Amino acid sequence: MEHQDLTDSRKDPLCISQLKISSSSLDPLPQANMAEDLTKSRRHSPIKVEGSEETWGVEDDDDLTDPIFDTIEGNGHSDPTSCFDADLSEYKKKATVIVEEYFGTNDVVSVVNELKELGMAEYRYYFVKKLVSMAMDRHDKEKEMAAFLLSTLYADVIDPPEVYRGFNKLVASADDLSVDIPDAVDVLAVFVARAIVDDILPPAFLKKQMKLLPDNSKGVEVLRKAEKSYLATPLHAEVVEKRWGGTDNWTAEDVKARINDLLKEYVMSGDKKEAFRCIKGLKVPFFHHEIVKRALIMAMERRKAQVRLLDLLKETIEVGLINSTQVTKGFSRIIDSIEDLSLDIPDARRILQSFISKAASEGWLCASSLKSLSADAGEKLLENSSANVFKDKAKSIIREYFLSGDTSEVVHCLDTELNASSSQLRAIFVKYLITLAMDRKKREKEMACVLVSTLGFPPKDVRSAFSMLIESADDTALDNPVVVEDLAMFLARAVVDEVLAPRDLEEVLNQTPEAGSSVGEKVIQMAKTLLKARLSGERILRCWGGGGIETNSPGSTVKEVKEKIQILLEEYVSGGDLREASRCVKELGMPFFHHEVVKKSVVRIIEEKENEERLWKLLKVCFDSGLVTIYQMTKGFKRVDESLEDLSLDVPDAAKKFSSCVERGKLEGFLDESFASEDSQSKKQNGSSSSSG
């Protein structure tokens, strides 16, 4: 991912750029604590930051330097119970030991396991503080190790609010740190800048903390130095990442290449001890399913190596090097790609079935946890050739859309490629759209949301797309460590845009092959948390700069968009050009909100009969061009129906006029013949029952 100047690189709270290797598939924190942890993460829900278009950070009413949050330093409110003090004291001792051992061994997995075993997730902010403060007084090697460990633990082991709080404590204690560490201001400034570059801290952290600290404090010096000396310079991301010599950690592609190399060397030599050493050296236990997958594919391709490779997998499981979950996932990924594999290995299905039978009989695979290899009779499978052709075309269409922003062109292209029965292809398109957007800037993320809303795909297809995205989240996390947060935001946005209903969230989880997986549960729970937040709709809409994708504007509030619609209709009705009015509707950049154009147009028709034909022409042009979909048209009419009672105060015969509008809408093809004024009918029924009473 590209890193730009600070003012250009700010991202939403749930969209974080590439780290090297993430432990996103590590075992999650106990499920019982998940709801509480996610509730605490609301302190990072999107908000507006003064003087910028930034939308993430910590809400003003949750002051992280307030004494209520300061329970470990003794300079604020502290729990009076001795139990609390004992727990915290014990945690401090063990955290110090864990950090010391980590600096000696560089064993990330050991740290993960020890923190989980230690528990007490509410104190993990102290681990962040202790890790950084101890590294500050050591060599560059330990500083780099600390920065890498924080990136690895972020979100999976240490929740974002705890990381934020840990850095808050560090900055607040900069004066004390400077007593023992002469260059504490500079070193801590680099740590803060590195955390922002690695996206484990939001850029809003700087301004937020500056407002809370005394102007003459060392903490303010740290924040200013981080901003001006490290984050405001050209190529700042690269400079910050290499400040302490960089790391020898690898990207996803590096890991895959190393896995291939170790398997090839093992096939040639048969040296299991060396293979085990190489697997341990990768230090990516959450990615061991890739070893299983690649070993199985290599065994299919090299018949003579089958026995040796299967024997390697068996022993890695017996000695506990690869756990059963990773084995199951590796086999499942092969099953998912069996159709593609069959193009190169004609009897791939038969060979894989024999591998499954052998592994199950030897006791190192639970075959019952795998999907069936036989084609699902209830779902029409796509021809491999046509599916592959569509995937390539889909990527091309999406990339072109990100450049042009032309939704109508995408609709036209998909109309050509798809038919009514192409449910699987529609899901694939949405999956690729969101996947490509997640690796780009806020503008493309916003454009992806707009396009999903505009396409009007059936909810079932969109649910399938998100299920596929969740299923592949562990792999995506290697390049995007916060894929969970990204997917949660995309899901929440789909609900706000009414592409999905709130009840569809659970269905997404149920459709995921690994139903009940920790990743799926995290995504769904986080999406629900986002949707429950105060003013969630507007926040989610504005998170990626909602509105004005063609002008790349920072976004508009719902109120501002309504005002723009009102103005463009007034100008058009008073003699404006039809083409200009259509252009203005398009440039709103919020096709999911076009029902408001329909609503206001119909209301004006009811109120000003002499201008109705001009407004009908505008609606027809917008509808025929695809600018307003039948879904948005129907929703607009329904919203007028819901407001008839208020409208009748100014226009006594509003209900009658609206009925005429509905008939005209059906005649023009805007509305389905089944459209009925449900609210009006219920009001009539209520009225008749009350009058009879």
From Swiss-Prot:
Placement of sequence motif Nuclear localization signal 2: 430-437
UniProt entry tagged with the keyword Nuclease: no
Name of the protein in question: MA3 DOMAIN-CONTAINING TRANSLATION REGULATORY FACTOR 2
Gene: MRF2
PANTHER family the UniProt entry points to: MA3 DOMAIN-CONTAINING TRANSLATION REGULATORY FACTOR 2, PROGRAMMED CELL DEATH 4
Swiss-Prot/TrEMBL induction comment: Induced by dark and starvation.
SMART domains documented for this protein: MA3
Keyword vocabulary terms for this entry: Cytoplasm, Nucleus, Repeat, Translation regulation
Consequence of gene disruption: Increased susceptibility to dark and starvation, and to treatment with the TOR inhibitor. Decreased translation activity associated with altered ribosome patterns, especially in the dark and starvation conditions, in which mRNAs distribution is altered and rRNA abnormally degraded. Slightly early flowering time under long-day conditions.
Organism expressing this protein natively: Arabidopsis thaliana (Mouse-ear cress)
Region (Disordered): 25-60, 673-693
